[in-house]
Design a protein with these regions (language model features):
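Generic alpha-helical secondary structure signal
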Residues: 10, 18, 24-25, 49-51, ...
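N-terminal secretory signal peptides
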Residues: 1-36
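Short, surface-exposed coil-to-beta transition loops
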Residues: 13-16, 28, 38-43, 57, ...
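Long terminal segments
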Residues: 1-11, 65-125
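Mature extracytoplasmic domains of secretory-pathway proteins
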Residues: 21-23, 35-65
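Short hydrophobic/aromatic-rich beta-strand segments that constitute the beta-sheet cores
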Residues: 27-31, 52-58, 87-92
Length: 125
């Protein structure tokens, strides 16, 4: 999710982003991530006045589990934010279990969302 620990614009991983916006501000970004390993992910970003206010991310990772095939890990993250980036509420679920939100995970989401917003904003003009 949100380019987690991947160089998302490199040969390791890349994303396709679709933006929806009335003039002048972007209100929604849909990002589909493709990894060079068995994994699937998508992120949804909702903006108000150029600030991220809601984020939904889902990622399905596949890991080799000895000789028994692949083990799956499903991670879902939902964030509700103030316009200054403070978290109002969150839900992080890993394989059906509630999990805590690390500061590093939050920083990755916020920095990636800001970077995407700038990239897409530059392209819309």
């Amino acid at each position: 999710m949100a380019g987690q620990k991947y160089d998302w614009a490199s040969a390791k991983a890349y994303s396709t982003v679709t933006a929806y916006y009335p003039e002048p501000d972007i209100i929604f970004l849909n990002e589909d991530l493709t990894y060079r390993k068995p994994a699937e992910a998508f992120n949804l970003y909702y903006y108000k006045d150029a600030h991220l206010i809601h984020f939904i991310g889902k990622k399905l990772d596949y890991f080799t589990k000895n000789k028994k095939g692949l083990k799956k890990q499903l991670t879902k993250l939902t964030l509700n934010l103030e316009s200054d980036g403070d978290v109002i509420s969150y839900h992080k679920i890993v394989n059906g279990e509630l999990s805590s939100l690390d500061d590093s995970d939050l920083e990755e989401v916020l920095s990636h969302a800001e970077e995407l917003y700038k990239l897409v904003g530059d392209k819309k003009e």
